[in-house]
Amino acid sequence: VEIFIGKGVGSILFGQDEQQIINQLGRPDKVYELEGSKRLLYFDLQIEVAIEYEHENKFGWVEVKNPDATLFGQKLIGESIEKVLSVVSAAIAHTPEYEDCGSLEIYFYESLWLELQFELNRLRSINIGVLFIDDNTPDWP
């Protein structure tokens, strides 16, 4: 599965509604609510899709934990912080915000809505969201 910053992951695109996601990926293995969104979990794909209530119940955020997923053409899940940041820095000219949460370290590229979560020096999750035209207006692909 390929991750497309600002667009989506694989065949699903930001801006699609829940039924469109289900039509493409099938029924989710688990559904729960979190922080103003409905979360659809797909165990085999190892992704968590967020349907955001504040944005007309559209797909606006995804968490990817699949080790076969690619970002900028490379498989990065499980790789070291140094390697991942090197690959990302070569592809984009942005400096991330850094947050140390103990065993979890987060690098967030706000202008790209790209979040990299590391645990024990290894990338555990690549999270991306829809880009915004302004503070409240999503730029749907």
Residue ranges and their predicted role:
Residues 1-141:
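Short helix/turn-capping signatures at newly exposed starts of structured segments
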